[in-house]
From Swiss-Prot:
GO molecular function, one term: DNA binding
Assigned protein family: Belongs to the UPF0335 family.
Protein name: UPF0335 protein BMEI0289
InterPro entries per UniProt: GapR-like, GapR-like_DNA-bd
Source organism of the structure: Brucella melitensis biotype 1 (strain ATCC 23456 / CCUG 17765 / NCTC 10094 / 16M)
Taxonomic lineage: Bacteria, Pseudomonadati, Pseudomonadota, Alphaproteobacteria, Hyphomicrobiales
Amino acid sequence: MNWRNLVSDDITSEAQTIAVGQLRAFIERIERLEEEKKTIGDDIKEVYAELKGSGFDSKVVRTIIRLRKKEDHERQEEEAMLQLYMDALGMS
């Protein structure tokens, strides 16, 4: 082997080491975030249990939260379609 091959092998090895380190860092970040997501999910469940214990309907609250995430025009369009379908089925 000549010196060019040795240098090339060293660069390749170093690049692989860096890539493995980056991959490991990404995976560890994702794992930490997944754990945080689980913790937040557990916290949200506790809040729903508290509101249910206070006499509120958790299903209705979930609907309100879903609707609040939408733009006004999206929500109004959805409500209009719902009303149209209910009228068509004689449900209003």
